Amino acid sequence: MDATGGGNYDAKPYLPGSHAVKWFEDGEPTTLVDDYYSSRTLVDKMIDYVDASDPEQPFFAYLSLQAAHMPIQAPLDYVDRYNGAFDDGWDVKRQERLQRTIDRGLVPPTTTLAPAPAVHRAWDDLSAEEKAVAAREMQVNAGMMEAADFHIGRLLDHLEATGQLENTIVMVLSDNGAESGKTSFDGLANLGLDAIKLIEGFDTSFENLGQRRSLTAVGPEWASVLSAPFDLYKFYGSEGGLRVPMVIAGPGIAASGVEHAPVHVADLVPTMLDAAGVPYDPAQFYGHSALPMLSGRTDTTYNDNESFAFEVSGNAALYRGQWKITRNTPPRGDAEWRLYDLSVDPGETTDLSAANPALFEDMLAEYRAYTENVGVFEVGPDDYAITALNKNLMTKVIHKYWPHMLVFLLAVGGALFFAFKMGRTALRRRAS
């Protein structure tokens, strides 16, 4: 479904160029219920699956919500709970979020914010109308998250009512940092997007933001707030793209509050197998079981000499203890590697590669070994994430909308030809 750009209220695709949203159940095409809203309906379906299972047998359930992926949409009562909450704008809110995370002990007091990318707009440069729209978009995002929280709570309440919660380990986490997608651009690109919105029947009025037939996103500036105090957001190798919270509770899990030791996504399966008492060969997994740390038997899943890595379309990172090397490609990065000490600088503001050349080179060599081991293909500028995404979208747009483009070009050509003829006729009359 996600590859075809599904919305939250119906099967209408939001991605330009997508012809239909395809939903499947048990490998077979299916249709949505009439009153579909993504978080509510997906939780309803998960409850049905749990109820249909054998209560005497263990179960594994994976609930992948659309919240808060674009298009951000939420019932109006959730959105209106945040009236005025974001009127101060993203510059103020990013600073507030930094201080709040420090006050709550989520990051060290030495944490500072990386400068916002030059392409980000300053809040004070926006018109009053632009500020109102931007604040409302962030309200929709907050409402969507609260709606998701409510429906996750319904699932947990159901497990508790059926006597299964006390014997169930629950993990709640995100797949990546905040999404920076936007639904308006500058110049001709925006004219083209407005034409697509008109063709597809989107209602982008202020009153309809986040509602049915809307096309709403928070954009890169609010994404920086959502990822703060970390740098950047989804797609990138900075902490804002990679570091997300994970909440886990259940039998055998110590109620220890905030744990700062990292857990890699590849650790999840070994952790679940370990918790369920299922024998497995650790050598067959890239990740480690985090259960010893989660149960309070150890302080961390990785010792200071162990590493783990990520790569997505040229953006990459490798972690070892308190250290991290990272590379971000354009348009937000320059494809150069940098070294950070996350124990004091999780905002990734001070590159320490020149001060620690031996460590830097050793970690680079380890990253290269990782890419060879897992088969990472090094991409060039034409294949960087955003570049490739835009090229693919443009190909789909041309394929889907070429008849409309042809009609438009013929209309423009006809108008120009008519204007030319009228002008020439007028000149002849003046000459005579």
What do the PLM-derived regions correspond to, one by one?
Residues 29-37, 86-88, 137-143, 231-235, ...:
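Active-site rim elements
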Residues 54-61, 164-170, 304-305, 319-323:
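Loop/turn elements at helix/coil->beta-strand transitions in domains of secreted/extracellular proteins
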Residues 1, 73-74, 157-249, 390-399:
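Histidine-centered active-site microenvironments of extracellular/periplasmic hydrolases
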Residues 46, 59-65, 141, 145-148, ...:
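Beta-strand elements within well-structured catalytic alpha/beta cores of enzymes
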Residues 1-88, 92, 118-143:
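Formylglycine-dependent
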Residues 113-119, 125-134, 268, 331-336, ...:
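Long, internal low-complexity/basic segments
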Residues 3-7, 211-242, 253-342, 389, ...:
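C-terminal cap/loop subdomain of S1 sulfatases and analogous C-terminal strand-loop tails that border
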Residues 4, 61-71, 113-121, 172-180, ...:
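Short, solvent-exposed turn/loop segments enriched in Gly/Ser/Thr/Pro and often Arg
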